[in-house]
Amino acid sequence: MALSGILSKRVIAHRADENELEDDFSSSEELNTLGSEDDEDEDEDEDEGEGEGDESENEEAPDNASSEDDGDNDIKSSLSQISFGALAKAQQSLGPLKKGAKRKHGSEEEEEEDNKNTKYKKSKSDALNELRERIRRAKEEKASKSEGSRDNELLDKKHKEARSSKHAPAVQSSKYAVSRRRVVVDGENVAQVKSRDPRFDSAVQSYSHNAKSSSYATSHSDLAAAKNYAFLNEYRDAELKELEEKLRRSKKDDEKARLKKMITSMKDRKRAMENRERERQVLAKHRKKERELIKEGKKEKAWFLKKADLKKEALKEKYESMGAKERQKGIERRRKKVASKEKKEMPRSRRMVEG
């Protein structure tokens, strides 16, 4: 089996033409005929030797040995000239060897190949193990370095944070190089520049107003914008009616919840705008009244409303403009709102007793 394997490998590497195969077979036949002629000559010599004496046998013995050596050399030379294709063809014609009939030479070659393979595998496994060991060591060194750097960073942070007071200047180690670019303003504490709309910007308006005179005062730019875009209130009212109509016609719960949320948001926004407008009117009336009193000489200095007083006056103005029934409903709603707010601020133990 080993010989057949070796022959097949060599046949794959060196394929011969059909003409070479025929020539090789003819040469092998000639060798066979030569071998048969040599055998006949040897038989004739033996017969002649039997008729002669012992002296002739001693003389012909070296001649026979030399002839046999010449024949062996001729066979070896002829076999060396036979191509691998002819040998493969002969092996195929003879058929494969049986399992138990292994040649000694083939078994030795297989053992050598097995030994080489095992040595190669061992060397490969050793190289892999060595590579894995190097990778493991490199990882350990990297982890130790990272841990050391983290410890150093923590120590540096602690050293930086340790100051006499929060107003003390920051301390920087002299080991670190100073940056060539000087930080004038810290970017984190600087407010980002926002885009400005000239329609609502007081700096672009044709008149100026000191909005810092009171914290709740409304600037003239806001008033001008409200006056210029008053038609948006009509659009909002139309949109609110449309949403209420959709809510009345809708049947899906998800759609109803979404529409209710939108309607509530729009109503709250509208109510907040009305309250702001009412407070502005109350504040304008109060300023006008104080200005007239100063002109008449009844007052030397103007009296400015506080936020709480302004809200009370605005609420009073709101209830005075309502009807009787609407005023009663509003007062009841206000009372419930204040009661729930007080209940939330009350401790839980008192809340349970009074509830």
UniProtKB/Swiss-Prot annotation:
This is rRNA biogenesis protein RRP36. Belongs to the RRP36 family. Residues 1-178, 193-217, 263-284, 319-355 are annotated as: Disordered. PANTHER family: RIBOSOMAL RNA PROCESSING PROTEIN 36 HOMOLOG. It holds the Pfam family RRP36. It comes from Trichophyton verrucosum (strain HKI 0517). Keywords: Coiled coil, Nucleus, Ribonucleoprotein, Ribosome biogenesis, rRNA processing. Residues 123-164, 271-282, 319-331, 339-355 have a biased composition (Basic and acidic residues). Residues 111-150, 233-325 form a coiled coil. The gene is RRP36. Residues 203-217 have a biased composition (Polar residues). The lineage of its organism: Eukaryota, Fungi, Dikarya, Ascomycota, Pezizomycotina. Component of the 90S pre-ribosome involved in the maturation of rRNAs. Required for early cleavages of the pre-RNAs in the 40S ribosomal subunit maturation pathway. Residues 36-72 have a biased composition (Acidic residues). Associates with 90S and pre-40S pre-ribosomal particles. It is found in: Nucleus, Nucleolus. It comes from the Eukaryota. GO terms for biological process: maturation of SSU-rRNA from tricistronic rRNA transcript (SSU-rRNA, 5.8S rRNA, LSU-rRNA). One of its GO terms (cellular component) is 90S preribosome.
